């Protein structure tokens, strides 16, 4: 089984209204960007698993190997609205397709730049989510694939099982579980490949306190541990392949960060 560990810091451009609680209003809306560093060295000397109350997580000495940003976008600027509507119309959705898109998403969350999916690579992977009714739900996956002549083709996949990523508000020791599933069939673009992802999501607010990063210090954060027990499945020229893996994310949320 393959294990992946991710270190994230998520903040908001809105001020928090209560201490040690994070609401849907604190979460990013529309186009928003925060600085992010990819660390390639020195991780083995750091302990990301410390939990509890009034903690101090000091990662000030982490390297800044690759600088970038983690961001969200509006659905209209995601690059996946037109492919979704086109795919919906071809499936017989007609004039209801834009309405359906708007009902499924009001924010696009950039996942990763690229994803190695066995026999091919997915690019610009994005979760089109709906933030409403105190929930953040992943409903559509957007991604791109490079065809045989080097052209980037956008593809969208509506979740067969929508994924409740977060429930709001959350505070110390809150937790939740959900299940998500989505997949794509690439035969329509000349690739004899079917790719499917299924996973169980479990998250818990396992600490609060102060987070120190190479960028700055955050004095009032909630630490969330998210575990995805995931299976990636590919059918390639009628040959099924499967890879189970466990993905662990540690995320610190600061409601008072602009």
What do these predicted ranges mean?
Residues 19-137:
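Solvent-exposed N-terminal domain segments of exported/luminal and surface proteins
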Residues 28, 237-258:
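A short, surface-exposed beta-strand/turn
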Residues 9-11, 61, 101, 166, ...:
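Exposed boundary/loop context
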Residues 1-24:
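Bacterial Sec-dependent N-terminal signal peptides
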Residues 143-240:
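Short helix-loop boundary/capping segments
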């Amino acid at each position: 089984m393959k294990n992946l560990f991710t270190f994230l810091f998520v903040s908001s451009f809105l001020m928090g209204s209560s201490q040690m609680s994070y609401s849907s209003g604190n979460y990013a809306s529309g186009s928003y960007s925060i600085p992010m560093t990819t660390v390639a060295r020195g991780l083995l000397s750091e302990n990301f698993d410390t939990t509890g109350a009034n903690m101090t997580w000091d990662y000030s000495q982490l390297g800044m190997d690759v600088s970038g940003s983690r961001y969200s976008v509006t659905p209209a600027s995601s690059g996946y609205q037109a492919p979704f509507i086109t795919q919906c119309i071809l499936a017989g959705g007609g004039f209801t397709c834009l309405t359906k898109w708007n009902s499924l998403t009001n924010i696009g969350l950039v996942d990763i730049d690229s994803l190695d999916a066995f026999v091919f690579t997915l690019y610009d992977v994005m979760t089109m989510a709906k933030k409403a009714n105190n929930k953040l739900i992943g409903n559509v996956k957007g991604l791109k694939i490079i065809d045989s002549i080097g052209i980037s083709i956008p593809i969208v996949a509506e979740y067969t099982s929508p994924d409740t990523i977060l429930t709001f508000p959350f505070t110390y020791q809150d937790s939740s579980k959900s299940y998500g599933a989505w997949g794509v069939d690439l035969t329509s673009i000349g690739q004899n490949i079917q790719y499917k992802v299924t996973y169980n999501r479990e998250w818990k607010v396992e600490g609060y306190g102060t987070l120190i990063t190479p960028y700055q210090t955050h004095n009032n954060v909630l630490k969330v541990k998210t575990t995805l027990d995931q299976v990636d499945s590919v059918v390639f020229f009628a040959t099924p392949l499967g890879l189970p893996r466990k993905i662990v994310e540690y995320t610190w949320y600061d409601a008072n960060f602009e």
